[in-house]
């Protein structure tokens, strides 16, 4: 009888059921010989590439051969040598949330009631009075898409211009009563996440308002943490919530929510005091696509390997000696490096 000694993070409440903790190691299996052809590899470490600002890195994006990074309230550009230059300042509210998106011409940052246009050399406040505030932004077919906080309404910028708005360019996600808490564009479709449901919209080309709801594309699962939404492996991942509870991790299988968390991780998430502050990013390395889900309040980081189908094997945790959780808040691939 072969005893499987290698696996993922699947610790249960009862160690008699499962006691396995896979920490800073990820599993790689041979599909031809899954029982004998498995190995655990160490998660690569981190080295300093650039030193900017005094606060945590809140967001990063690659744009026009530079990285634009937000450190506390400072905006920096970073070049391929790691040299960082402060190019401006933004105003953060109490949540200190920042979201970035970009078109060919510029990056836009939103912080709640404020928005900023960022180039490689300047930061300019958006002054158009029709900007209605947002913590969320993404790019679709020339438009930036935003969601009005604490509402079901979303709106778009002028085409190819994140500083210009029309008060009539808005719509409402109304298939359910939940407010929009997250949004992401995937395969040229706009996914609007509520706390209990998801609506999917697309560019219909209509002249009055270009976006329209996709018929029948409503998911009865919402989002528990807006910053847990991340694209990877040709799909979307997020920490879920619906009318019956919360704390399951999902990936989209076309328009179907597929649970990818295992019972051990779901139990641990359920014991956390505030999962709404969870953050996530995704990256690909050595043939593995990793979804990195962190809970800053509880100092925990869980990582899902999309190359493994079995949730009992696909997860591991990452820990840092000084912090408990993984140190990374966000990620961008630039200059041939994972930053």
Where on the chain are the PLM-derived regions?
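N-terminal beta-propeller domains
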Residues: 1-85, 133-195, 199-201, 205-206, ...
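Beta-sheet-dominated scaffold domains
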Residues: 2-9, 13, 101, 105-106, ...
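A short beta-strand motif characteristic of beta-propeller blades
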Residues: 45-51, 84-90, 122-128, 166-173, ...
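Short loop/turn positions that demarcate and connect the beta-strands within blades
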Residues: 54, 92-94, 129-132, 175-178, ...
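Glycine-centered tight turns/hairpins at beta-strand boundaries that repeat
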Residues: 72, 110-112, 149, 233, ...
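Short, surface-exposed terminal/edge motifs of secreted or surface/virion proteins that either
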Residues: 72-80, 114-124, 156-158, 240, ...
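A broadly used, surface-exposed interaction patch
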Residues: 79-109
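Hydrophobic or amphipathic alpha-helical targeting/insertion segments
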Residues: 99-131, 136-138, 145-146
């Amino acid at each position: 009888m072969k005893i499987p000694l290698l696996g993922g993070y699947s610790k249960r409440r009862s160690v008699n059921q499962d006691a396995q903790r896979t920490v800073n190691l990820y599993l790689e299996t041979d599909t031809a010989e899954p029982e004998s052809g498995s190995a655990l590899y160490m998660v690569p470490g981190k080295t300093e590439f650039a030193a900017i600002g005094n606060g945590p890195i809140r967001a990063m994006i690659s744009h026009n051969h530079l990285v634009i990074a937000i450190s506390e309230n400072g905006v920096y550009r970073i070049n391929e040598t790691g040299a960082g230059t402060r190019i401006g300042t933004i105003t953060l509210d109490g949540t200190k949330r920042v979201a970035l998106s970009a078109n060919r011409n510029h990056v836009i940052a939103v912080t709640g009631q404020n928005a900023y246009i960022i180039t490689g050399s300047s930061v300019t406040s958006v002054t158009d009075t029709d900007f209605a505030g947002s913590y969320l932004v993404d790019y679709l077919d020339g438009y930036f898409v935003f969601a009005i906080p604490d509402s079901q309404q979303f709106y778009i910028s002028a085409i190819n211009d994140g500083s210009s708005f029309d008060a009539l360019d808005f719509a409402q996600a109304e298939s359910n009563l939940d407010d929009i808490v997250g949004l992401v564009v995937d395969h040229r479709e706009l996914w609007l996440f509520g706390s209990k449901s998801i609506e999917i919209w697309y560019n219909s080309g209509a002249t009055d308002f270009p976006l329209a709801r996709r018929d029948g594309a409503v998911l009865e699962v919402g989002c528990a943490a807006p910053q847990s939404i991340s694209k990877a492996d040709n799909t979307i991942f997020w920490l879920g919530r619906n009318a019956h509870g919360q704390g399951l991790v999902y990936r989209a299988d076309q328009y179907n929510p597929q649970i990818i968390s295992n019972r051990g991780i779901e139990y641990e998430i359920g014991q956390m005091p505030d999962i709404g502050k969870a953050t996530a990013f995704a990256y690909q390395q050595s043939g593995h696509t990793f979804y990195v889900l962190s809970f800053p309040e509880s100092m925990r980081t869980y990582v899902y390997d999309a190359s493994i189908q079995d949730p009992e094997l696909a997860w591991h945790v990452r820990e840092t000696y000084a912090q408990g959780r993984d140190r990374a808040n966000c990620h961008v691939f630039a200059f041939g490096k994972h930053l």
